Amino acid sequence: MEIAIILKIIICHWIGDGLLQTEQMATQKSKSTYWLSAHVGAYILPFIVVFYNILGWVLLMAILHWIQDWITSRINTQYLQVKNNTMFWNSIWTDQMIHYVILFTSITYFI
């Protein structure tokens, strides 16, 4: 896989999962499919712009991101409620690692 594609994926993910995620999306996506869907809609925007030529992959990433965040946001909320910061941050980093594994392995089938 070319380094340019790797960098594009990293940047798109950073923008979509970080910069475009509002506080309300972050705190409400574990409780509301509306806010989870709004987050995924915002998340996927940079991917649509950069990877417009493989929209099938972009759609697959939106679906997989929704499923993963549906699960992990609930786990993260539980750690926050019991004030277990170590497990919360371990869960966040694990979530991000899973996102990248999915992104990098799946794109190889589309390029």
Identify the residue ranges that each predicted region occupies.
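Transmembrane helix interruption/hinge and helix-loop junction motifs
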Residues: 1-4, 49-58, 111
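Functional transmembrane alpha-helices
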Residues: 58-67
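Amphipathic alpha-helical interaction segments
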Residues: 48, 52, 56-57, 70-74, ...
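Interhelical loop and helix-boundary elements at the membrane-water interface
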Residues: 9-43, 66-108
